[in-house]
Amino acid sequence: MKCPFCNFSDSKVVDSRPDKGGAAIRRRRECESCGKRFTTHERVEEVLPLVTKRDGRREPFERMKLVNGIQKACEKRPVSVETIEKMVDRLETRLQESGEREIPTTTLGEWIMSELHGVDQVAYVRFASVYRSFKDINEFMEELQDLLKK
């Protein structure tokens, strides 16, 4: 690991422990040249499937797109950032566990709606209105009636 102080390429690990939540390893390192200490965080490189768009294009999965879309649906709602992060964590885990190399946006959208349904029904309807591209008020009303039945 390159030292951030002198750019020397060798360092020794002085201390190693799990990071908060256990998703990473926090390591305290000491440069073998200048002797200064610095911290690194190591994470497992996750392989997530490609997202297949409605027009057939394929894009790498981007966590921030999910976070931004859910935050937009939850705007001015009593949904904490922590709750949104946990939702996205569950969705990423589901993606990994699916074992699929590609996932259609339709499937991903349904998963997001399922998560939102259990958290905030107004956010659910907001997301559904964009995701399902309602063409008129009748389609919107049908979604609301389905929501009330659940």
Swiss-Prot record:
GO terms for molecular function: ATP binding; DNA binding; zinc ion binding. Residues 49-139 form the ATP-cone domain. Pfam families: ATP-cone, Zn_ribbon_NrdR. Its cofactor is Zn(2+). Keywords: ATP-binding, DNA-binding, Metal-binding, Nucleotide-binding, Repressor, Transcription, Transcription regulation, Zinc, Zinc-finger. It comes from the Bacteria. GO terms for biological process: negative regulation of DNA-templated transcription. Binds 1 zinc ion. A zinc finger (unnamed) spans 3-34. NCBIfam families: transcriptional regulator NrdR. Negatively regulates transcription of bacterial ribonucleotide reductase nrd genes and operons by binding to NrdR-boxes. Belongs to the NrdR family. This is Transcriptional repressor NrdR. It comes from Citrifermentans bemidjiense (strain ATCC BAA-1014 / DSM 16622 / JCM 12645 / Bem). The lineage of its organism: Bacteria, Pseudomonadati, Thermodesulfobacteriota, Desulfuromonadia, Geobacterales.
